[in-house]
Amino acid sequence: KKFLNDKIYWCASSTHEGEELIAAKAYLILKKKIKNLILIVIPRNVQRVSEITHMFSELGLKTHRHSLNKKIPTDTNIYIVDTYGETKVFFKVCKVVFLGKSLTLNGGQNPLEPARYNCTIIHGPNVSNFHEIYNLLGKNKIAFKVTNQNQMIKKINELLTKNIPTKNIKNKIDKIGDEILNKTFVEIKKFIRQ
């Protein structure tokens, strides 16, 4: 956490093959505009970490793996979370999260966990498993769909450089939940009356 104190950072979480490369290339462009920028990558499958680390190295990026439990070098570009069960720790400190399985694969990942931690969510168009939730989050400006790397860069730059409040995201989520629950009760009552 101390390492992040003077940094600006965003997270690419639950990433699948191909998405880490997109995030890393976006990072390289954003780094030219935003000083002290760090990308936190949380791959869905930690068995791919060696492959991911090598790919980042090929791009000239310096990485640090969370499992090393060592002091983080000051020239680190990408912090790789290669352990299970700690995602929420990083959601608590990140303002912006790209959720994977949405740019290169179909289905998407559940956006409610990062939203509960006041994260603004960026996702690709392939979110069929959570379509309704993403629509609700999109209408409430909690989640933003991007279809390519350029859109990702533009949206992340906007979210990190503009003073967009995120503290009320959890309140918006609670309100959305209440609305869904009320609609569900209305539908159940209709069904019971039949």
Residue ranges and their predicted role:
Residues 1-194:
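Nucleotide-activated sugar donor-binding and catalytic core shared by glycosyltransferases
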